[in-house]
């Protein structure tokens, strides 16, 4: 044992019990070699809660369960399995030969139980135990019984304890699982193909973000962890897979806050022979489908109710900014735009053009007002290097979906002109040379793919973590990621 580890009194007592188990010939960390579990806690209540005490006595229902001990009170023990809690009744007279091992049980131990279902005088479903076995001895006590694990940072750092101590946490992640399942169902019904594309990219692309860098020893090559799945998915459109999607991890070497984690989960989907309007329709239908299927159509934002089944609004970015600033940003030169930006205390980078400033003003003035589901359309070309232009070439056929002031989806009519795409990449490269670390690089392989012909298409990316936040009404992305990225703990 590491002599630097200081044990608490309870931890010392539990380790002493290991020796007592050993003296009794009882293994404390077993392989599972028993008859299979035949029921879980939620099924017990669903199947048998309507039976009376006498009916249960007559039927003699035999159950096999396992779980972690949460409480011990006289002859009653409550264990927790994956779906909830089960009460056990132990008559020590009937388990005389196991009385010594029974006496060594602690809260946190994992046990295996066979028994007969009964009801107590209070009408609680309970398993009367006729066989039990210790499967795993808990050497460290669980969080304090009545308060659970309340330190927020510690909850994220020790999610395993959080799941044991706070039953509602597990519900969040069941909801997350259901949301992802419904996303797949939505696209599978439309004959989309789910694919997996590389996480190691030699060229950055598909988004504006700083990457995590790594190195492949055998290839003697530097790689980036992907910041988006867009470019490989569009190559698949070129290859004739007309409907494609990917659910996967994305990595961005950026700040951490309530809506950003360096690694997160997204879905990107692409559809040939479609456009921005179809992408907005698909996105709205997807969110409504999930909300309806999960019974989560009404979301509370403090005193405001957000109705996910109502028609989503549509606004134009430049019009919204013009209205908020009382300045016509469709007809403005760069010097005037810079002057206005500085009046709002916006830091103007040397590579900024009018489009950058429109986007900055939108983020400052408009985003915070978007509570009900709203598509914001008409993004400037400077911040949309992969989107097709609108009739006014300064803007693109791009939209983002905002709900409760946060961005949930980014979609556009895909740019399929390889010559224009090269010009956009070159403009991005100039921005990178001028200090924009998030600008895209020139991806020659992607440009080559476009030269073979990308059909007219629409594409969309949705942050799944934020969607889970919305539907579970959580304020922090850390609440919906099992193991969020945390600062190293100071010892």
Swiss-Prot record:
What SUPFAM superfamilies is this protein classified in?
Class II aaRS and biotin synthetases, Nucleic acid-binding proteins
What is the main EC category here?
Answer: ligase
E.C. number = 6.1.1.6
- Which InterPro entries is this protein grouped with? Aa-tRNA-synt_II, aa-tRNA-synth_II, aa-tRNA-synth_II/BPL/LPL, Lys-tRNA-ligase_II, Lys-tRNA-ligase_II_N, Lys-tRNA-synth_II_C, NA-bd_OB-fold, NA-bd_OB_tRNA
Q: How is the cofactor bound?
A: Binds 3 Mg(2+) ions per subunit.
Q: Where does Mg(2+) 2 bind?
A: 407
Enumerate the UniProt keywords alphabetically.
Aminoacyl-tRNA synthetase, ATP-binding, Cytoplasm, Ligase, Magnesium, Metal-binding, Nucleotide-binding, Protein biosynthesis
Query: For this protein, what reaction is catalysed?
Result: tRNA(Lys) + L-lysine + ATP = L-lysyl-tRNA(Lys) + AMP + diphosphate
**Keyword Transferase belongs to the record:** no
Residues bound to Mg(2+) 1: 400, 407
Where does the source fall among the domains of life? Bacteria
Q: Which GO terms describe its molecular function?
A: ATP binding; lysine-tRNA ligase activity; magnesium ion binding; tRNA binding
Q: What Pfam families does the record point to?
A: tRNA-synt_2, tRNA_anti-codon
Cofactor(s) the record lists: Mg(2+)
What GO CC annotations are associated with the protein?
Answer: cytosol
- Give the matching HAMAP family: Lys_tRNA_synth_class2
How is this protein organized at the quaternary level?
Homodimer.
Annotated family: Belongs to the class-II aminoacyl-tRNA synthetase family.
The molecule here is called: Lysine--tRNA ligase 2
Q: Which gene is the coding source of this polypeptide chain?
A: lysS2
């Amino acid at each position: 044992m590491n002599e630097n580890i200081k044990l608490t009194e309870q931890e010392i007592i539990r380790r002493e019990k290991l020796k007592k188990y050993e003296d009794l010939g009882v293994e404390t960390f077993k392989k599972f070699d028993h008859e299979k579990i035949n029921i879980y806690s939620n099924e017990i209540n669903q199947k048998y809660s309507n039976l009376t005490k006498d009916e249960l006595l007559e039927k003699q229902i035999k159950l096999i369960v396992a779980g972690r001990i949460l409480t011990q009170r006289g002859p009653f023990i409550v264990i927790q399995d994956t779906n909830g809690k089960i009460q056990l009744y132990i008559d020590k007279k009937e388990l005389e030969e196991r009385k010594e091992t029974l006496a060594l049980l602690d809260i946190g131990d994992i046990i295996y139980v066979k028994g007969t279902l009964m009801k107590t005088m209070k009408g609680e479903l309970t398993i009367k135990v006729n066989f039990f076995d210790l499967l795993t001895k808990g050497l460290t006590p669980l969080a304090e019984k009545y308060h659970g694990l309340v330190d927020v940072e510690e909850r994220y750092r020790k999610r395993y304890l959080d799941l044991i101590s706070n039953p509602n946490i597990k519900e969040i992640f069941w909801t997350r699982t259901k949301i992802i399942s419904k996303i797949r169902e939505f696209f599978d019904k439309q004959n989309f193909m789910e694919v997996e594309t590389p996480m190691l990219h030699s060229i950055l692309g598909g988004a504006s973000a700083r990457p995590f860098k790594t190195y492949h020893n055998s290839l003697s090559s530097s790689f980036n962890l992907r910041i988006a799945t867009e470019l490989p998915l569009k190559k698949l459109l070129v290859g004739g897979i007309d409907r494609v999607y990917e659910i996967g991890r994305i990595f961005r070497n950026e700040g951490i806050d309530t809506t950003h984690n360096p690694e997160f989960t997204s879905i990107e989907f692409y559809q040939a022979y479609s456009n921005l309007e179809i992408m907005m329709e698909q996105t709205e239908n997807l969110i409504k489908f999930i909300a309806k299927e999960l019974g989560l159509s009404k979301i509370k934002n403090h005193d405001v109710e957000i109705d996910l089944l109502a028609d989503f609004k549509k606004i134009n970015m430049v019009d919204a900014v013009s209205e908020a600033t009382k300045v016509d940003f469709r007809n403005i030169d760069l010097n005037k735009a810079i002057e206005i930006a500085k009046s709002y205390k916006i830091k103007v980078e040397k590579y900024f053009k009018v489009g950058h400033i429109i986007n900055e003003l939108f983020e400052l003035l408009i985003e915070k007002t978007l509570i009900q589901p709203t598509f914001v359309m008409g993004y400037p070309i400077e911040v949309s290097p992969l989107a097709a232009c609108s009739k006014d070439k300064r803007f693109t056929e791009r939209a983002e979906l905002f709900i409760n002031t946060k961005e949930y989806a980014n979609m556009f009519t895909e740019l399929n002109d390889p010559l224009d795409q090269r010009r956009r990449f070159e403009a991005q490269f100039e921005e990178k040379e001028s200090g924009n670390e998030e600008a895209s690089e020139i991806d020659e392989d992607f440009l080559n793919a476009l030269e073979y012909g990308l059909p007219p298409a629409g594409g969309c990316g949705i942050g799944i973590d934020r969607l889970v936040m919305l539907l579970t009404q959580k304020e922090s992305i850390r609440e919906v990621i099992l193991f969020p990225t945390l600062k190293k703990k100071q010892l």
